[in-house]
């Protein structure tokens, strides 16, 4: 049994932006105090959770796990002036009893099937100018089932999943003012494959493929959104990384590795769902070389990481639904080389 509070305070003040194509770092933009009534956004959130869980072995091959969890939150969210005078805010509290259930059946010592079901209860995170009435917590139900293979060297998993959410909130522009409103329901379903472990004593692998279909099931604000894929979620994602341990030498141990990540294409929409932009697919290559040794009897590790070796311009995500005309697109990092050093005392 676990009992514990979490308290989080966050204050945000929007400042000016710089030109990403021609940034000027030597003459930074002066940050001025904002005296407007709605200049500062705050979100004071307290959450409390209490759960109990039990695992039962019906046989050596059949295992069931069940649990109950009570989630409670106390939230004050809104906007304020520089002197912390609240110009518009919402105070609400709520709680819900959730349950989860899981099972595992082993066909052989190496092969098993599994099933999991869980519920979620999450308070809304408001960052808009106006709070339009109470914002009930987002609630979800998830189901997952699949097969798992595991031996002394490798483990592989294939799983089907389905996640339904309701009380989904969205920023809605009302007469030129952004409001956070409950708009409806969303669903995410797909299949995932994972492979991890040792191919040989020196060669390891980490591979993953995910197909995800995420769409709006219901949207009270805009009927055009129904059936559309959610922004920022490519249908196809995959990665493959290999690492090879070259071996021990008089001066230390050397490991090298590398691989690629694949992001499929997807559509991003403006807030009226009348305009769309197709984000192109991308393959990004990463690599590393690591060296472990001892200096004065202390373990020392050096690792040189190279990310996005081909300097590919790509988008890992989109914000989505920003305005009638703009579709914000986040850019992935450019080619990056990082050297990390660790000393164990």
From Swiss-Prot:
It holds the Pfam family TonB_dep_Rec_b-barrel. It is found in: Cell outer membrane. A motif (TonB C-terminal box) lies at residues 328-345. Gene3D superfamilies: TonB-dependent receptor, beta-barrel domain. PANTHER family: BLL7968 PROTEIN, FERRICHROME IRON RECEPTOR-RELATED. Belongs to the TonB-dependent receptor family. This is Uncharacterized TonB-dependent receptor HI_1466.1.
């Amino acid at each position: 049994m676990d009992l514990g509070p979490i308290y989080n305070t966050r204050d945000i003040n929007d400042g000016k932006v710089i030109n990403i194509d021609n940034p000027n770092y030597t003459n930074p933009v002066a940050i001025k105090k904002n005296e407007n009534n709605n200049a500062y956004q705050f979100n004071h959130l307290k959450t409390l959770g209490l759960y109990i869980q039990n695992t039962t072995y019906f046989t050596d091959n059949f295992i069931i796990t069940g649990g109950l969890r009570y989630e409670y939150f106390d939230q004050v969210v809104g906007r304020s002036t520089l002197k912390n005078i609240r110009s518009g805010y919402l105070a609400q509290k709520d709680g819900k009893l959730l349950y989860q259930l899981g099972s595992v059946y082993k066909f052989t010592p190496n092969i098993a099937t599994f099933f999991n079901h869980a519920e979620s209860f999450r308070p809304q995170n408001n960052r808009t100018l106006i709070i339009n009435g109470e914002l009930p917590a987002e609630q979800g139900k998830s189901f997952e089932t699949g097969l798992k293979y595991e031996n002394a060297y490798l483990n592989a998993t294939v799983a089907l999943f389905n996640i339904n959410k309701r009380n989904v909130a969205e920023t809605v522009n009302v007469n030129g003012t952004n409001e956070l409103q409950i708009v409806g329901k969303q669903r995410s379903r797909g299949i995932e494959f994972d492979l991890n472990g040792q191919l040989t004593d020196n060669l390891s692998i980490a591979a993953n493929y995910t197909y995800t279909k995420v769409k709006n099931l219901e949207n009270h604000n805009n009927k055009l959104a129904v059936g559309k894929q959610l922004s920022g979620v490519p249908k196809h994602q995959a990665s493959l990384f290999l690492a090879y341990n070259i071996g021990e030498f008089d001066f230390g141990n050397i490991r090298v590795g590398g691989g690629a990540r694949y992001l499929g294409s997807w559509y991003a929409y403006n807030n009226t769902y009348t305009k769309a932009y197709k984000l192109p697919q991308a393959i990004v290559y990463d690599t590393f070389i690591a060296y472990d040794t001892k200096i004065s009897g202390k373990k020392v590790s050096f690792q040189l990481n190279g990310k996005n070796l081909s300097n590919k311009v790509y988008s890992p995500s989109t914000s989505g639904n920003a305005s009638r005309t703009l579709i914000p697109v986040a850019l992935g990092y450019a080619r990056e080389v990082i050297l990390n050093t660790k000393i164990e005392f």
